[in-house]
Amino acid sequence: MSSSVASTENIVENMLHPKTTEIYFSLNNGVRIPALGLGTANPHEKLAETKQAVKAAIKAGYRHIDTAWAYETEPFVGEAIKELLEDGSIKREDLFITTKVWPVLWDEVDRSLNESLKALGLEYVDLLLQHWPLCFEKIKDPKGISGLVKTPVDDSGKTMYAADGDYLETYKQLEKIYLDPNDHRVRAIGVSNFSIEYLERLIKECRVKPTVNQVETHPHLPQMELRKFCFMHDILLTAYSPLGSHGAPNLKIPLVKKLAEKYNVTGNDLLISYHIRQGTIVIPRSLNPVRISSSIEFASLTKDELQELNDFGEKYPVRFIDEPFAAILPEFTGNGPNLDNLKY
């Protein structure tokens, strides 16, 4: 088992039956990040429900909220934070807020960040990520986010990529903001959906190593090679879609059910603990206040149990988030999940 697991053991052994909301990791620049966060990539028809979900999460002990320019949930996240700050429930310095730069603004990171800060009603974010290593063409749309088509496609339905785009330009602009001693809008920078190949180029050509690589990972997609690479380079993984996207299919995995019963926790708790136990940040998404507040029990999985879960995923891999625009990236197909590998 990797030493990332061992380092996590040192944390939890010093705590008596810890809640997952009480566990923190350190980024490679020294900033502390809560191991558990609330994801807010919510369905468009339920965007407004994000506000109550965020309030419920913070009241339950969550201190990490993950959002993005592209989610259109930033205003609702901001409203929730504003109300909780005003009533004294929380202090800004106790929160960790992550947002992201979408590929349509690949060469306008400053604009993206400012729009996110305005929507959130904040002076800074704790972590700014490059959402995808992609560059989209800018197509105007008065009804779109910031007057742009979020993911432009041509008449045949193919994604329109910027002809002159280089995904590293986005990261270099993040880097410039982060390195400016007079710019205090971000405390850390990182990436999302980067493969080993893309990370290798970034590390070679850029000055600041990403603190985080946010990717889809769970027992159906353990990402072991990527996990090892990131650990070797002091980059933390953040797991999105830990339950397996819509319908939470990973809760149906027999081994998950078995281990949840053994540790007397919910399936949600088990899947969250699976990540934290391996030194991975995890950001489950939910709009259900009861589920949010009840999914904070830590299951101290053994190394053998972690290995068993990872072996299952190596044998039956399923990537649930595989959008058409990602088809040009390594390890993506753009064709959606391979449901034949779902094993219940």
Curated annotation (Swiss-Prot):
<comment type="subunit">
    <text>Heterodimer of a heavy chain and a light chain.</text>
</comment>
<feature type="active site" description="Proton donor">
    <location>
        <position position="71"/>
    </location>
</feature>
<dbReference type="GO" id="GO:0004032">
    <property type="term" value="F:aldose reductase (NADPH) activity"/>
</dbReference>
<keyword id="KW-0963">Cytoplasm</keyword>
<dbReference type="Pfam" id="PF00248">
    <property type="entry name" value="Aldo_ket_red"/>
</dbReference>
<dbReference type="GO" id="GO:0045149">
    <property type="term" value="P:acetoin metabolic process"/>
</dbReference>
<keyword id="KW-0597">Phosphoprotein</keyword>
<feature type="binding site">
    <location>
        <position position="131"/>
    </location>
    <ligand>
        <name>substrate</name>
    </ligand>
</feature>
<dbReference type="InterPro" id="IPR018170">
    <property type="entry name" value="Aldo/ket_reductase_CS"/>
</dbReference>
<dbReference type="InterPro" id="IPR023210">
    <property type="entry name" value="NADP_OxRdtase_dom"/>
</dbReference>
<comment type="similarity">
    <text>Belongs to the aldo/keto reductase family.</text>
</comment>
<dbReference type="GO" id="GO:0047816">
    <property type="term" value="F:D-arabinose 1-dehydrogenase (NAD+) activity"/>
</dbReference>
<dbReference type="GO" id="GO:0045290">
    <property type="term" value="F:D-arabinose 1-dehydrogenase [NAD(P)+] activity"/>
</dbReference>
<feature type="site" description="Lowers pKa of active site Tyr">
    <location>
        <position position="100"/>
    </location>
</feature>
<protein>
    <recommendedName>
        <fullName>D-arabinose dehydrogenase [NAD(P)+] heavy chain</fullName>
        <ecNumber>1.1.1.117</ecNumber>
    </recommendedName>
</protein>
<dbReference type="InterPro" id="IPR036812">
    <property type="entry name" value="NADP_OxRdtase_dom_sf"/>
</dbReference>
<dbReference type="GO" id="GO:0005829">
    <property type="term" value="C:cytosol"/>
</dbReference>
<feature type="modified residue" description="Phosphothreonine">
    <location>
        <position position="151"/>
    </location>
</feature>
<dbReference type="GO" id="GO:0106271">
    <property type="term" value="F:D-arabinose 1-dehydrogenase (NADP+) activity"/>
</dbReference>
<keyword id="KW-0560">Oxidoreductase</keyword>
<keyword id="KW-0520">NAD</keyword>
<dbReference type="GO" id="GO:0005975">
    <property type="term" value="P:carbohydrate metabolic process"/>
</dbReference>
<dbReference type="InterPro" id="IPR044491">
    <property type="entry name" value="AKR3C1"/>
</dbReference>
<dbReference type="InterPro" id="IPR020471">
    <property type="entry name" value="AKR"/>
</dbReference>
<comment type="function">
    <text>Catalyzes the oxidation of D-arabinose, L-xylose, L-fucose and L-galactose in the presence of NADP(+).</text>
</comment>
<dbReference type="GO" id="GO:0052588">
    <property type="term" value="F:diacetyl reductase ((S)-acetoin forming) (NAD+) activity"/>
</dbReference>
<feature type="binding site">
    <location>
        <begin position="241"/>
        <end position="295"/>
    </location>
    <ligand>
        <name>NADP(+)</name>
    </ligand>
</feature>
